[in-house]
Curated annotation (Swiss-Prot):
Assigned keywords, A-Z: Cell cycle, Cell division, Cell membrane, Developmental protein, Membrane, Metal-binding, Zinc, Zinc-finger
Transmembrane segments: none
Organism: Marchantia polymorpha
Basic and acidic residues bias: start-end ranges: 253-286, 295-407, 696-709, 735-771
Biased composition (Polar residues): 414-423, 591-607, 663-683, 722-733, 785-805
Positions with biased composition (Low complexity): 452-467, 511-527, 608-662, 772-784
Protein name (database record): Protein SOSEKI
Motif Association to cell membranes positions after renumbering to this chain: 493-494
Membrane topology: Peripheral membrane protein
Domain notes: The DIX-like oligomerization domain is required for polymerization, edge localization and biological activity.
Lineage of origin: Eukaryota, Viridiplantae, Streptophyta, Embryophyta, Marchantiophyta
GO biological process: cell division; plant organ morphogenesis; protein polymerization; regulation of cell division; specification of plant organ axis polarity
Chief localisation class: membrane
Zinc finger (C2HC/C3H-type) residue numbers: 864-893
Amino acid sequence: MVLVGQGMEPEEAFTKVQVVYYLSRGGQLQQPHLIDVPVSTHSNGLYLRDVKRRLTSIRGKGMGDSFSWSCKRNYKNNFIWQDLADDDKILPLSDGELVLKGSELYTGFQEKAEFMDGQFDPENASQLPNKIKKLASKKFDFEAVKRSLDMESDKLQEQSDLAAALSLSLQLMSDPHMKRFSKDKSMDLNQQVMNSLSQAKSNAAEECMLDHSVTDISSETLHSEESTVQKFSFNETIRERSKSTASASSSGTDREHSYGPPRKTESMGRERSLPRDLPRSREVSRELPPQVPREAPREKSREMSRELPREAPRELQLPREAPRELPREVPRETSRELPREAPREISRELPREGPREVAREQPREVVVPREVVREVSRELPRDVSRDSSKAVKDTAKTRQEKPEELPTIKTKKSPTCSESGDSTPFMLSPRRLMAALSSPSPEKKFGKLVHSSSTRSSTPSTSAASTQCEDSLPNINIRLAKQATCLSNFRLCGNANPHATDSRPDSPEHPLAAAAQPASGAVPQSPNTRGHQGGPYWPRWRSGRKPRTSSEGKEGPEPPTPPRGPMTKPVTVAKPDPPLKKSFEFDMNVSGVNSAMATPFLQTENNSPSSSESSSAAVSSGKKPASISLSGTSDASDGGNGASSTASSSSEVQNNVSVKEVITQQLPSPSSSEGRPSLNIDTASLPRVSISEAISDVRETVKTTRPDSPESPMKPNPPSSPVRTQLSSSPSFNKRIEDARARARSLVSKEIRSGESRSSKDLLKENDRVKTSSGSMRSGSTRTPNNKNGTTGAGSKTLSGTFNRSPPRINSIMWEDAPLTPTKKEFVNRDDRPLTAGRTNLDWEKTLQEAASLSLPPPDFGQILQECGQCGRTFKPDSLKVHMRGCHALRRSKDFQPFNGTSVAIRTRLQ
């Protein structure tokens, strides 16, 4: 309570003083109050008892005694609250105001808190104020609290009682030994449980108190009742067990306590609905299982199966004294000789009486270690497992289909191996052959495959003979390489050239024709080939059709549909193979070209007599080594004229590249008389590229293939058939290229010496003009007008060019360099112009910078810049047109007034 006194005017008897007071409740000051306190004129000042007397007359009794009072006074340029008693004088502030604050008594607040907590002491009640005494004398309403607590405890008790009773009844009914109780005993047990529950509930209702002791008592009684019921059930089960054991020992035919079908009781129906995850007794009786007669109906057998304990049959199904027919451990020597079908044969030979006993005892008795099974599967070939499966064919009637046989590659016995006995055929799958073919060292890969197959097929008795056969490994490698090429030709199908009659596999001149014929003369036919009318693993061409040309419009030879299914029939080689030539026919993608190119060169390095003879014959005859021919299919072709063009870039050339033809003749070179190795490119619909061992240079010539030429092994081409182009380099051609480069270098040096700032693009244009002029000089003939791709070419480094399908009359040299990228007109945006660092991109500043850089007089901005009529910004005329399309200024500026240079100079100075 703050008391503010203003203007203490002296009177004869009393004077009134204004006092401002604040009341503090709960640590917070309330709104201030103002009262007038009468003061006698004879007193020295205003005392606290005068203020309390005035508050009691205004606010009621106990108002002054319920608070502790303090006055506000100045202290060191600040103020403090000074506590006051009844006889203390209230000191005014510097401005003469009287301010009081009333705080709640600490003693009264503490006693009130203790009383609410239940720690109220009636002995100290005389020391409290009168109002607090009256509050303490009132009685606390315990009845309402007790009723609410009773309702909560009843609900909790009902829930706990029901849960406990249900769990107890479920435990009793789930006990397998309690099933033997009679109906009277089960009813007595249920009645006892219900009595215990009702007694516990009544005790809980009587002893329910405020401190929640009722729940503790009821839980204790419930636990005690549970323990008594459990003890009773345990004693009953012990008695029943003793009776059952005694009756079983006295007479084995007593069915009263056996596991036979008992009488239906009320607990049986209750048991079927019980959950399976309830705790059950783990004790299993050692009694024999019940003997169910065959004439019993299904319902009785189901009831018996439900009544039987689930743990008993696990130990009573099989007798443990079963005879052991096989040892647990098999020695490694004998396990290696066992075929893969040994476990199946053993299981089939076991007696069929008692299937459960045999099925249970078999994994215990026949224990084959995992290492033994792995070694048997690694050491034994697949033929041995097939033979063993044939031996057990009578017993395995359910197995009707045999597994698919993989293609076997059989070789003829060598002279060194004929003495040791019959040779076992090598089991090499096409996957292994293709992996060996695509490896960087196919010779080593084939050697490893042959060695592994020979060691698999050899037995301990023929180990000495296998060492003698190692001398003939190179010959076997050669034959396997040829057979691998045949398999790859079949698996990776391609389009053979119809004109190359000598390179067709079905022709008698082909080096692999003899190796592909079987011994009996019959051709095995693959059942999975669709539309394929041939036996060997290469496509046969259909006879009776002429090759189609673009001019005649006749039907050409159609490539056969490649086989899509796996190879199932083996290819057997019975005749001695002819001498190996230095290249074979493949069909593969671009990724396999490198491996296909490396394969013949590695095969020519073999130590076989056939390869050495063929290489020596080639050297003696003066011909160069044989080469691998690559062919790429051209998709672009014209209509009636028969002109076609292949892909010019290296990415387009890499589309479909496949080895197509064996070229063994020497092609003459125009630049040299010895016939140096070259790169031949045929511009037919299936162009062939023959790459020799060493490519020294690249030249381009065009020659026609005549049918009467002794050099050409091809068929006579039709009049409109494509011609063969041969790329080479001549000294005159190289000299022109060097001259053009020298001119370009001289131009660059002249520009540098003269100091003229010419761009690099101009120099490139000049160089391109020089090259095109030199190319037109050396071409000597017009290019074909039927070319679809336009002007495309390739350099000498990339080995790719434009192969134009030209008429047969062309007999001249054609070469064009790859043109540079077409030059475009330079367009530099006004914002992308080079500016000095630190400058802005405004148009007028750009103009000033351009004028300063070019040493020009300052421009007239009135003629260069124009102001926007909407937003007032200045732009160049072309920029203003663009700006006006998107200018959305809200306010319009004044009319356009072009300013001159002086105003701009003044504006720049001000800025």
